[in-house]
Amino acid sequence: MALHELTIGQAREKLLSKEISSQDLTKAVLDRIEAVEPQVDAYLTVSKEEAMEAAQKADKALAQGETAPLCGIPLAIKDVMCTKGVLTTCASKILGNFVPPYDATSITKLKEAGAVLVGKTNMDEFAMGSSTENSAFKTTKNPWDLTRTPGGSSGGSAAAVAADMCLGAFGSDTGGSIRQPGSHCSVVGLKPTYGRVSRYGLVAFASSLDQIGPFAKTVEDAAILLQAVAGYDPSDSTSVNVEVPDYTTAIQEDVKGMRVGMPKEYFEMGGLTPDVKNSVDQAIKTLESQGVEVMDVSLPHSKYCVAVYYVIAPAEASSNLARYDGVKYGMREERDSLIDMYHATRSSGFGPEVQRRIIIGTYALSAGYYDAYYGKASQVRTLIMEDYKKAFEKCDAIISPVAPTPAFKLGENTDDPLTMYLSDIFTLSANLAGVCGVSVPCGFSSEGLPIGLQLQGSHFQEEKILRLGHHFQKATDFHTKRPNL
């Protein structure tokens, strides 16, 4: 097995036994990037020199007895998290020259853990999209089929892990932006509970929905990555001070007797392809064979999720993105008057999808429409939260598909925003309710395209969904398959 193909767990064993060095591992990953990046276009920035320096530092720490799980491990970061001294563009022209003067809390924690950050990955502009086609700079391709999307908005991170261009990666999930690309690229994608991981230094899209989470080759690796970044942070007012369990130990516990709920509304929705349904049905049988009890649950307000999300998220985006006006930082189009400068800067700096969502959000918040749109959406969001609360009184986790279809063709839905929005129909509700969710590879379509299984857990119950996912992977081999590049 080539070094770039290793899981984090495997690489850690080899690093601790001195079989390999972090410099060997990092060079192998950088060589892999050089070989396949021209095909995949997963990265916006590759930090070769900084990565090799970090690897050298990690090797010194390992020689002195350091045993931190991520010491010397090459990781990629979605270009929406602030990295001191390294471009952070959010895949937008308006931030095309922005170099943050500080690190996001998650980045600080990863550096303290000895991780080697190899680069920043492509994404939909400001994390608005489901295909990574909304980037101002490049279009990322799915490593399993280069004519298809990797999903979005964290498509660059998912594609980088799938193509072995890093051992793990981080993204952000506002409506499915980690889980959906995880499903489309056959990697594990975890959205933690809202407040579990600090959002300090995460460039905001929708502040009540955004959450940082990991991509990995295995559930065990995802647990290691979550362990490194989870925890309370006073710099983030939405961070919650809840004890962080030992995820890597918790996932080893038996799943026998655990209860998993099937929301009938998810399986009755239109658009679910037979391949996806069959793969998820088979995954459910696999868990049942391990002693998991599967039962029906109801999430009756699921049918309103898309409508609610596409009022609340654009409304928050309209407010958050008002700061990009050409005055303090980022791109500026010089004009004679201040108003003309604002208009020119924002018109040329933001792409069409971002402009669309700002307009929708501004409309939903405007006088005369606030109660009818934003107010009503907020009320229905509360009902969605109540649905989850009732469901989790009966079960430990909720099981469903991640997406109704496998990855679609590049360009197939770019002129049809509604079809694009509906690709997140099974993932949006977890963000609206603030619960955790994970995508685990569970099969392939007749065309050889990856399919993911979604497990959702109650607030701060990540160890339960990770345990189920880990035991599912012990019984299957979907996660061991890699695309031919």
Swiss-Prot record:
Keywords: ATP-binding, Ligase, Nucleotide-binding, Protein biosynthesis. GO terms for biological process: translation. The active site is at K78 (charge relay system), S153 (charge relay system), S177 (acyl-ester intermediate). Pfam families: Amidase. Coiled coil: none annotated. It is an enzyme of class 6 (ligase). InterPro entries: Amidase, Amidase_CS, Amidase_dom, AS_sf, GatA. It comes from the Bacteria. One of its GO terms (molecular function) is glutaminyl-tRNA synthase (glutamine-hydrolyzing) activity. Its EC number is 6.3.5.7. PANTHER family: GLUTAMYL-TRNA(GLN) AMIDOTRANSFERASE SUBUNIT A, TRANSAMIDASE. Allows the formation of correctly charged Gln-tRNA(Gln) through the transamidation of misacylated Glu-tRNA(Gln) in organisms which lack glutaminyl-tRNA synthetase. The reaction takes place in the presence of glutamine and ATP through an activated gamma-phospho-Glu-tRNA(Gln). Heterotrimer of A, B and C subunits. This is Glutamyl-tRNA(Gln) amidotransferase subunit A. It comes from Desulfatibacillum aliphaticivorans.
